C-alpha cells in the first residue's frame, strides 16, 4: 500500500486541531500507518509506535520532525499499554490478531481520554487464514460496537486489497 492510500484511509478520523495530540499505533509493524498519521497531526504531537517486533519498527521514520515518535516493543494484545492518556488509537491490520475483541477494546478504552477515538483499518472478511487469524468484517465490527458501552462506529473509507477482500477504515467513538 502506498503512503497516500494510508493517509486517505485515516484522514477523516483524525481530529483537526492546532493543539498537540497523543496517539498510539498498535501493531505498528514497519510504520506505514504511523507515517500516515504523522502527516495529519499538528506540531508537538506524539505517536507511540507499538509492536512486538522491535526489528520491524527499527526503520520507522516519520516525515515530520515536529511530531515525536516513541517506539515501544511489547505484545499489545497481552502486555499492558503504558502510555499517557491518548487522544486516539490507531489499529491498522492489527485487530485481526486479537481473539477476544470485546475484552480487548474495553481494556484499551481505559487508556483513552473521554473524547478519544479508535481508528480501525481491517480486511472486510470473515474467513481466517494464517495471516489474518481472527478477521473482523465491518459488519461484525458494527455488531461488536453495540456491545461496547456508549460506543458508535462509522465507516470512513475503503480501498481494494491485492489479497482478496477490500480494506475498510472505521472510526470507533465513545459518547
Which ranges hold each PLM region?
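A short SAM/SAH-binding and catalytic strip from SAM-dependent methyltransferases
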Residues: 87-101
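A short acidic, Gly/Pro-enriched loop at the edge of an enzyme's catalytic core
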Residues: 77-89
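A short glycine-rich, Lys/Arg-flanked "PGG" loop and its adjoining helix->strand segment in the class I
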Residues: 102-117
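C-terminal alpha-helical "lid/dimerization" subdomain adjacent to the S-adenosyl-L-methionine
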Residues: 4, 39, 117-171
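Conserved alpha-helix/loop element of class I SAM-dependent methyltransferases that forms part
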Residues: 1-21, 36
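Class I SAM-dependent methyltransferase SAM/SAH-binding core
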Residues: 24, 29-79
